[in-house]
Design a protein with these regions (language model features):
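C-terminal scaffold of the Radical SAM
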Residues: 2-14, 26-247
Length: 247
């Protein structure tokens, strides 16, 4: 409801009817919306009826192209056959599924609520609901992740033939549980480049830990991703994003 109220307030702001301390006015004259992205958070916690209301509010304020690409992020742990069909009927034309890894151990380490099998079920539910444009989010350079494990994740996803694949390298952000556990390790890797170059006391400190991949391993994962996806016909359109021709 709050999001819908914000959308509905845009015409007033554009007409100069917003408070002095509000954001600068928008000039919407002549603008047509070609893409809409509903991100999160976890938008797939919303029922399809709520998504339909949000899109209706957008159309009341903006001129939306009839064939606009409308993307919604979805967590595989929350997407069901019924909700996938509901989102498609509500007007969503593209789903972005956050798999991150095909390794159960790596998923647990990331604190994800879904399993590999749940992702498969969600992907199939999306296809059955009529989604012919699906993105899968992946994450490399995870603690304890080997090049072989990353290659297995890529193989698993490529076999499903999604239209888009996003492959991001992990960034350990301050204020996150991962930073609490790996913040010092990140700083030491940035300083020394790899574990072999660290002082003996640090090598001993990290011995036996699920260590973050060093810079060379991270780079190898990136190049393997780029090479593998290119061979399968995916084109890179941003640094970490790949798509089949026409998408």
């Amino acid at each position: 409801d709050q999001l819908i109220r914000e959308i509905e307030s845009i015409p007033e702001e554009d007409a100069g009817q917003c408070p002095e301390n509000a954001a600068p006015r928008l000039n919407l004259t002549g603008l047509t919306v070609e893409t809409i992205f509903i991100g999160g958070g976890t938008p797939s916690l919303l029922p399809p009826s709520a998504v339909e209301r949000i899109l209706a509010a957008v159309r009341q304020v903006f001129r939306v192209e009839p064939d606009a690409e409308i993307t919604m992020e979805a967590n595989p742990g929350t997407l069901t056959p019924d909700s996938a069909a509901g989102y498609r009927n509500a007007g969503v034309s593209r789903l972005s599924l956050g798999l991150q890894s095909a390794s159960e151990e790596e998923l647990r380490l990331l604190g994800r609520i879904h399993t590999r099998e749940q992702f498969l079920q969600s992907f199939r539910a999306a296809r059955d609901a009529g989604f012919d444009n699906i993105n899968v989010d992946l994450m490399s350079a995870l603690p304890g992740q080997s090049e072989e494990s990353w290659q297995e994740t890529l193989r698993f996803v490529c076999d499903l033939e999604p239209e888009h694949i996003s492959a991001y390298s992990l960034i350990v952000e301050e204020g996150t549980p991962l930073y609490e556990e790996y913040g010092e390790m990140c700083a030491d890797l940035e300083k020394y480049g790899d574990y072999a170059s660290m002082p003996k006391r640090l090598q001993t400190k990290y011995e036996g830990c699920k260590c973050l991949p060093d810079e060379e391993t991270d780079r190898n994962m990136y190049h393997h991703t780029k090479t593998t996806l290119a061979k399968l016909g995916y084109e890179r359109y941003e640094i970490s994003n790949y798509a089949r021709p026409g998408y």
